[in-house]
Amino acid sequence: MTIRIAINGFGRIGRSVLRALYESGRRAEITVVAINELASAEGMAHLLKYDSSHGRFSWDVRQECDQLYVGDDDIRLLHQVEIQQLPWRELSVDIVLDCSGVYGSREDGEAHLAAGAKKVLFSHPGTTDLDATVVFGVNHDRLESGHRIVSNASCTTNCIIPVIKLLDDAFGIENGTVTTIHSSMNDQPVIDAYHHDLRRTRAASQSIIPVDTKLSAGITRIFPQFVDRFEAISVRVPTINVTAIDLSVSVRKAVNVNEINALLQKSAHESFRGIVDYTELPLVSADFNHDPHSAIVDGTQTRVSGQHLIKTLVWCDNEWGFANRMLDTTRAMAACGF
């Protein structure tokens, strides 16, 4: 049975989800019946077709009034501010993928359900009272039919959690720190402008900018055993896509670089195939643009100090990889039944 979805919010993630659906060949399984976005229909179609990070969309895109056509598929375009007014019941929507970045509470999810959707998947961590927070490949098998309001966590959580799991299962993590080296985002100005975070008043293209991150909370939401044992910081850098994560963990078992890389490489081809990738090529961030994996381990950067302190570097396309996981989680939610 085809899963009928609606996308609420057609920004970076919303558009990536739609493109990934068509480019990954999953169109036969999932149908987009509607997109809700306050921007103009013309602007929505234009930014779907032409993208500064991901290039031109290979499918034919047309827009007529409030209808978007992708190939032979027609998608209804909505411009509704209030969730409760969205026609999810009329459109027989199975799952709403809320990619707005604005909504993420249980109350927001219940508003989608009241409008007629059967389930809701948020594209960011959301509040802690949701039915489930999923990092696909790690805990998606714990989804149940009663989980109606779900979070897909964050792009950085999806990147680092599989690697943490692999290292913990093999070597026993005591504690760790994470530094996210993240591409600039749309909450940063092109030139200096006012923002409540004074660092984010500064031009995105001119500085490396420290910003707040909730990644440590994201880690402990998935792995509560690490409460008070992981800390994270984040900096934004002047690139428009792809993120690197510097992970340092102390482990109980004595270990060397070859053992770590062998584990991560084997897992990329077996238990985490399609989720984690591994490379020892001399690559840079641009080479991981449009990569569908949640995480790509750079084996050339693995280090060990004193046999118990591990440092790894993990790449991800923070848009494209996450968009593909949104689709994976959508399928997993549907497989549990409605």
Swiss-Prot record:
Binding site for substrate: 154-156, 200, 213-214, 236
Active site as annotated: 155
UniProtKB keywords: Cytoplasm, NAD, Oxidoreductase, Pyridoxine biosynthesis
GO annotation, cellular component aspect: cytoplasm
Lineage: Bacteria, Pseudomonadati, Pseudomonadota, Gammaproteobacteria, Enterobacterales
Main location class: cytoplasm
A biological process from GO: pyridoxine biosynthetic process
Protein name, as recorded: D-erythrose-4-phosphate dehydrogenase
Reaction it catalyzes: D-erythrose 4-phosphate + NAD(+) + H2O = 4-phospho-D-erythronate + NADH + 2 H(+)
The organism of origin for this protein: Pectobacterium atrosepticum (strain SCRI 1043 / ATCC BAA-672)
Domain of life: Bacteria
CDD domains cross-referenced by the UniProt entry: GAPDH_C_E4PDH (cd23937), GAPDH_N_E4PDH (cd17892)
Site-annotated residues for Activates thiol group during catalysis: 182
Pathway: Cofactor biosynthesis; pyridoxine 5'-phosphate biosynthesis; pyridoxine 5'-phosphate from D-erythrose 4-phosphate: step 1/5
Quaternary structure note: Homotetramer.
Record's subcellular location: Cytoplasm
NCBIfam families noted in UniProt: E4PD_g-proteo, PRK13535.1
